[in-house]
């Protein structure tokens, strides 16, 4: 996958160039690199939320066939390959309203779902917090709730943008444990976290190159 800093400018310099990797079920690929190299952008490109200059993403489906976003359709791709932002967008209403909205989407109606309230309860999120308005929640509460909602949708791949950045150490470890069997691409700046969760690491460099270890 290749992405220019400004896709509207033909000869704009590259943000990252020809990044190539595969990810097996149950693996966690940690994405590292200094600020501004495109870590969040590459997750958004994989999620088909941000355009890219060249490349293709493929997902091994239940039918054991590799499918592109075009093959599956963008709504299906985003349901299977789900992006979780570092700072969840503050929406109108409560987290429960958000869950109801997601469950109303046609693409979600025939999928298995888990109870996000039950998932988040293990992380210290009590049921009453789901009824509060988003701005009334702390950053850590918002982060845990957004992640619980994503897990409840049971995507094949989670794209995680610093999912524990607003959490205390104990909550961080609980979230890591809940994600231990999941297939993830995970941005972190925490060396200790990388050592705990990663199967492999992708480092993006300021010159648009990358290393995979």
Where are these regions (language model features)?
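The feature captures the beta-strand-to-loop junction immediately N-terminal to the Walker
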Residues: 32-34
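Helix-to-loop junction immediately C-terminal to a conserved catalytic motif
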Residues: 47
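ABC ATPase NBD Q-loop/coupling interface
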Residues: 56-76
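Q-loop/switch helix immediately C-terminal to the Walker
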Residues: 80, 87, 92-112
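Conserved ABC ATPase signature
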Residues: 133-141
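Hydrophobic anchor residue at the start of the ABC signature
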Residues: 147
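Catalytic Walker B motif of ABC-type/P-loop ATPase nucleotide-binding domains
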Residues: 158-162
């Amino acid at each position: 996958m290749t992405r220019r800093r400004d896709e509207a400018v033909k000869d704009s310099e590259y943000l990252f160039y020809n990044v190539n990797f595969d990810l097996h079920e149950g693996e966690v690929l940690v994405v590292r690199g200094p600020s501004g190299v495109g870590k969040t952008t590459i997750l958004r490109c994989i999620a088909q939320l941000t355009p890219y200059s060249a490349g293709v993403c493929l997902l091994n489906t239940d039918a054991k066939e590799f499918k592109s976003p075009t093959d599956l359709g963008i709504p299906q791709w985003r349901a299977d390959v789900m992006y979780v932002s570092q700072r969840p967008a503050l929406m109108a209403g409560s987290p429960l309203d958000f869950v109801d909205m997601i469950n109303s989407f046609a693409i979600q109606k025939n999928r298995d779902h888990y109870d996000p309230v039950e998932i988040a309860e293990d992380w210290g999120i009590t049921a009453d917090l789901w009824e509060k308005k988003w701005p009334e929640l702390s950053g850590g509460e918002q982060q845990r709730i957004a992640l619980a909602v994503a897990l409840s949708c049971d995507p094949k791949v989670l794209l995680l943008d610093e999912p524990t950045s607003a959490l205390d150490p104990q909550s961080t470890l609980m979230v890591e444990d809940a994600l231990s069997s999941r297939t993830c691409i995970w941005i972190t700046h925490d060396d200790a976290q990388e050592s705990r969760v990663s199967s492999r690491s992708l480092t993006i460099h300021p010159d648009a190159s990358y290393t995979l270890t």
